């Protein structure tokens, strides 16, 4: 399971002109599910992201988590994180999970994040979305549950 995690001041997702998810200060997570991902990957990534200390403390040091600052989470499914561009000019998505499996694990990830008592908004699975992200810093982290980065 892969995530692009961005610290934001504001973020929203629009589908067909309608806002389906919107947050203030917090994290926007672009989430990709791989073909061999399991619930263990969901658990690892949810815990890592909710407790990741990438917000500044009173000394300007990245020392506070989403929970510490009372931040919000916007989770957007993005299978293209599994695009393999090493061969040719067009990405291959062979390593991305099938849509039914990806949706199940995506929804488990969202529910697990909510269980940490964090406000979670989402995009719409398998929809064409417009994502507006106001990256704070910018601070952007790449996290892979298989530790491939």
Curated annotation (Swiss-Prot):
Cellular localization per UniProt: Cytoplasm
Name of protein: D-aminoacyl-tRNA deacylase
Record-linked PANTHER family: D-AMINOACYL-TRNA DEACYLASE 1, D-TYROSYL-TRNA TYR DEACYLASE
Record remark: domains: A Gly-cisPro motif from one monomer fits into the active site of the other monomer to allow specific chiral rejection of L-amino acids.
Motif (Gly-cisPro motif, important for rejection of L-amino acids): 137-138
Top EC class, one word: hydrolase
Major localization class: cytoplasm
GO-annotated molecular function: D-tyrosyl-tRNA(Tyr) deacylase activity; Gly-tRNA(Ala) deacylase activity; Ser(Gly)-tRNA(Ala) hydrolase activity; tRNA binding
Function: An aminoacyl-tRNA editing enzyme that deacylates mischarged D-aminoacyl-tRNAs. Also deacylates mischarged glycyl-tRNA(Ala), protecting cells against glycine mischarging by AlaRS. Acts via tRNA-based rather than protein-based catalysis; rejects L-amino acids rather than detecting D-amino acids in the active site. By recycling D-aminoacyl-tRNA to D-amino acids and free tRNA molecules, this enzyme counteracts the toxicity associated with the formation of D-aminoacyl-tRNA entities in vivo and helps enforce protein L-homochirality.
Subunit architecture: Homodimer.
């Amino acid at each position: 399971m892969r995530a692009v995690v961005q610290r934001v001041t504001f973020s929203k997702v629009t589908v067909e002109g309608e806002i389906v998810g919107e947050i203030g200060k917090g994290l926007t997570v672009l989430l990709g599910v791989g073909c061999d991902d399991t619930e263990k990957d969901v658990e690892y990534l949810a815990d890592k992201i909710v407790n990741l200390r990438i917000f500044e403390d009173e000394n300007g040091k990245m020392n506070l988590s989403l929970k510490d600052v009372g931040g919000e989470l916007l989770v957007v499914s993005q299978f293209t994180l599994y695009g393999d561009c090493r061969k040719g000019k067009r990405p291959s998505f062979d390593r991305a999970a099938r849509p039914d499996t990806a949706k199940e694990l995506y929804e488990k990830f969202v529910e697990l994040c909510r269980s940490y008592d964090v406000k979670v908004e989402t995009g719409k699975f398998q929809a064409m979305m417009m994502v507006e992200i106001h990256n704070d810093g910018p601070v952007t982290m790449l996290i892979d549950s298989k530790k491939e980065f």
